[in-house]
């Protein structure tokens, strides 16, 4: 198995503010470097801990396009919200590679855009199993996307892919990740709350529940502890 980026460096001395998110989070002020020693790395942490924010920042620093949802007017706008990537350096092993970013929040927009493309070029759907993603359930369309997208050499970012997936589908996603990472062409960095996905064998898990960030064993993750306690109490 191989991987394409060996680590990233954060530059807190360059941050434009220490009062606004995400630059006010201790994990981003106290963490200088993350090492990626395995083809699959997970970011685990509570809501608001910064895991999805860092995932997106690394993807942008890798020059990977991220689909953007249409944003309606907001009561309060944080001008620093999407700037973290400007202060992240990526350490490539053999030069920059392409990849993709999956976000559950923006996947619905992607499905609709794909349908627009398919109206003029139905062949677009062959890549995703030959059926419109809009005619399938959310979970089914996500699995069609996952089956199609990771066979090429690259680095792949997934933000909470467990959304809308059944336990069986999560196990299938783990199989997809395992096959493509073991083939040596794909590296995955995944933000998740799922104790099922976090159980992926041979992965590194960064915990965002303490600062600075550090790699922890699976059984020390909060999702594992919480689900285990819940099931024992039943």
Model-derived regions: residue spans:
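Conserved glycine(s) of the Walker
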Residues: 50
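Conserved P-loop NTPase mechanochemical-coupling segment
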Residues: 111-136
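GG-anchored amphipathic helix commonly corresponding to the ABC/SMC/Rad50 NBD signature/C-loop
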Residues: 128, 132, 136-160, 168-180
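ABC ATPase nucleotide-binding domain signature region
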Residues: 40-42, 53-119
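Conserved D-loop beta-strand region of ABC ATPase nucleotide-binding domains
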Residues: 54, 159, 190-191
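C-terminal lobe/lid and adjacent interdomain/linker elements of RecA-like ASCE P-loop ATPase modules
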Residues: 168-189, 193-234
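The conserved Walker
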Residues: 46-47
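N-terminal pre-Walker A segment at the start of P-loop NTPase domains
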Residues: 1-32, 37
């Amino acid at each position: 198995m191989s991987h394409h980026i060996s680590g990233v460096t954060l530059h807190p001395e360059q941050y434009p503010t220490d009062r606004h998110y995400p630059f006010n989070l201790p994990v981003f002020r106290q963490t200088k470097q993350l090492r990626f020693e395995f083809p699959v790395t997970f970011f685990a942490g509570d809501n608001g801990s910064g895991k999805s924010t860092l995932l997106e920042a690394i993807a942008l620093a890798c020059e990977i396009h991220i689909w953007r949802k249409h944003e309606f007017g907001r009561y309060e706008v944080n001008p620093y919200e999407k700037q973290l990537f400007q202060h992240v350096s990526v350490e490539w092993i053999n030069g920059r590679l392409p990849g993709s970013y999956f976000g559950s929040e923006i996947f619905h927009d992607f499905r609709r855009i794909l349908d627009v493309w398919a109206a003029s070029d139905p062949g677009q759907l062959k890549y995703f199993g030959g059926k419109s993603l809009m005619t399938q359930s959310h979970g089914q369309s996500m699995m069609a996307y996952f089956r199609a997208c990771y066979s090429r050499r690259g680095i792949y970012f997934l933000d909470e892919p467990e959304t809308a997936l059944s336990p069986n589908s999560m196990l299938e996603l783990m199989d997809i990740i395992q096959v493509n990472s073991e083939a040596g062409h794909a590296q995955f960095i995944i933000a998740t709350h799922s104790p099922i996905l976090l159980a992926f064998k041979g992965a590194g898990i960064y915990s965002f529940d303490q600062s600075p960030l550090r790699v922890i064993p699976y059984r020390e993750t909060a999702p594992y502890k919480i689900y285990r306690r819940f099931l024992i109490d039943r």
